[in-house]
Amino acid sequence: MYRGLINSFKNTSKFSTSLFNNNNNCSTTTKSFTHISQQLRKVHLMADKEKVFKFAGIQLLCGDNKEENVQNAIKHIDEAAKNGAKLISLPECFNSPYSTSTFEKYSETEDGETVKKLSEAAKRNQIFLVGGSIPEIDKATGKIYNTCFIFNDKGEVVKKHRKIHLFDIDVPNKIRFKESETLTPGDSFSVVDIGYCKIGVAICYDIRFPELAMLYSKMGAKFLIYPGAFNMVTGPAHWELLQRGRAVDNQVFVAAISPARNPSSTYQAWGHSTIVNSWGTILATTDEHQSIIYSDIDLNTLNETRSSIPIYSQKRDDLYKLDSIKKQ
């Protein structure tokens, strides 16, 4: 794209240099440089445009029927893609109830029907897909994980993120939930290059650990995506706060995509899926109902944030350091 313009610029420069030796040709020289300047401006505008893409977060209503849950997800993926989204995320546990008593019943292997359907949707729509999460059972070990499958625009699984930090909490008189009663924690990082930029994927409770977000940023991720299902206690208190905190801490985009609230479910999701930019500004959000949120992800604004407040060049590596023990 750039080579032809660069060669044109070189040729015109040589031509113009000779013209400078002839005062009668100054006007011709000026016109030549004006033309090249206009062409280079077009290149810069095209480059900037390439740094902008549309993201969609799908807040799905999830029930007890796995097949209906998956069909609902596919329908909304198709809708989001039709509306121009190039990167789409589903919520945590979108194909099953969020309950330790049902994870085993709803679990699938990585070549199961849910993954196949998501793969087909990503390929058909030519989009990158962060596949929320599903209960995944490992064929070899029989262990169950809370897993997010990530697909490229050819429908290929390019990464799977197994939830690293299991949601084990006990808030007196409010809520008790222990994923570790059924699930096994993952032990790997999930950073994927989608062409526009690198994204880092983690699940729900993972967002409470700033070290993970910092490591993802260190690995080059400029957009962190968290399929999550905060509840009616932690949601109002921390959902938005944590997203804006991770965004500002690392000067990245952050999206947290929740299931819609199901009044008949034993676990009540907070909803309020949200997209935040690198300045901590909310770009899009919603309420507790099923919906799709959209936002243009403009990487130019991220670069502006980092230029204005250059925390990366101001870190004191002589005093402290963050590194991963296990490499990606």
From Swiss-Prot:
Q: Provide the CN hydrolase domain boundaries.
A: 53-299
Q: From what superkingdom does this record's organism come?
A: Eukaryota
* Gene this chain is encoded by: nit2
Top class in the EC scheme: hydrolase
Please indicate if the UniProt record lists Transferase as a keyword.
no
Q: What are the record keywords, sorted?
A: Hydrolase
Does the UniProt entry include the keyword Hydrolase? yes
Q: What is its EC number?
A: 3.5.-.-
**GO BP field:** asparagine metabolic process; glutamine metabolic process; oxaloacetate metabolic process
Instruction: Extract the PROSITE patterns matched here.
Output: CN_HYDROLASE, UPF0012
One family from Pfam that matches here is CN_hydrolase
- Family the entry assigns: Belongs to the carbon-nitrogen hydrolase superfamily. NIT1/NIT2 family.
Protein name as catalogued: Nitrilase homolog 2
